[in-house]
Amino acid sequence: MNLVDLWLSRSLSMCLLLQSFVLMILCFHSASMCPKGCLCSSSGGLNVTCSNANLKEIPRDLPPETVLLYLDSNQITSIPNEIFKDLHQLRVLNLSKNGIEFIDEHAFKGVAETLQTLDLSDNRIQSVHKNAFNNLKARARIANNPWHCDCTLQQVLRSMASNHETAHNVICKTSVLDEHAGRPFLNAANDADLCNLPKKTTDYAMLVTMFGWFTMVISYVVYYVRQNQEDARRHLEYLKSLPSRQKKADEPDDISTVV
């Protein structure tokens, strides 16, 4: 073996050793940055699995290079503003089977345009801010939530790229129209535009009118009672004055009798 072959062989060995060392450092770095209670692996990108970890909130120390994030089957109740803003490589986000009730307006800021799959099914979401899913390109699963079907929900679903697929399994737990409760959202939206419902101004006008009539009636009754009381007082005074007049009228007769 000549010197060139020997040098190439040693160079190749050094490169392989250096590569292995770099990979070990990366793995150690990823493991050291893994949130408490979660498992991290680097198969096809950094996968962070925090399923069934009894988490009550979304960890704030998630590695920036996270690609797949599983937070399902925990006790998370809300998604705060910009909680994922540093996860620019995030593609899959699973938040199913939690107790999520609140999603802040800017909850998905920073990942809305890169996220491919978002699972929010089996939570307690009734409504969200109309801008919460703005620019979201992900295939979203939001079924099995106690949705309140109204104009805001209609606007939210229209703003999502996968509107029809996302809305397909949404059931109205409650609705601005009572007859839509328990029905699929798409059926409710086909029956009526939830953002263009007639306002119930007639009821208020009726109440104002009834209150006006009621006030007039009460005023008339009060006036009538007071007027009757005044008439009764005058009549009573008149009656009291009658005996004295009769007595004065009888006095001349008594005098003539004595004479």
Swiss-Prot record:
LRR repeats lie at residues 65-86, 89-110, 114-135. Residues 34-64 form the LRRNT domain. It is found in: Membrane. Residues 1-33 form the signal peptide. Pfam families: LRR_1 (PF00560), LRR_8 (PF13855), LRRNT (PF01462). Its main location: membrane. It comes from the Eukaryota. The keyword Transmembrane helix applies. The keyword Transmembrane applies. InterPro entries: Leu-rich_rpt, Leu-rich_rpt_typical-subtyp, LRR_dom_sf, LRRNT. One of its GO terms (cellular component) is membrane. PROSITE patterns: LRR. It is a single-pass membrane protein. Keywords: Glycoprotein, Leucine-rich repeat, Membrane, Repeat, Signal, Transmembrane, Transmembrane helix. Coiled coil: none annotated. Gene3D superfamilies: Ribonuclease Inhibitor (3.80.10.10). Glycans are attached at N47, N94. Residues 145-197 form the LRRCT domain. The chain crosses the membrane at residues 205-225. Belongs to the LRRC3 family. PANTHER family: IG(IMMUNOGLOBULIN) AND LRR(LEUCINE RICH REPEAT) DOMAINS, LEUCINE RICH REPEAT CONTAINING 53. This is Leucine-rich repeat-containing protein 3B. The gene is Lrrc3b.
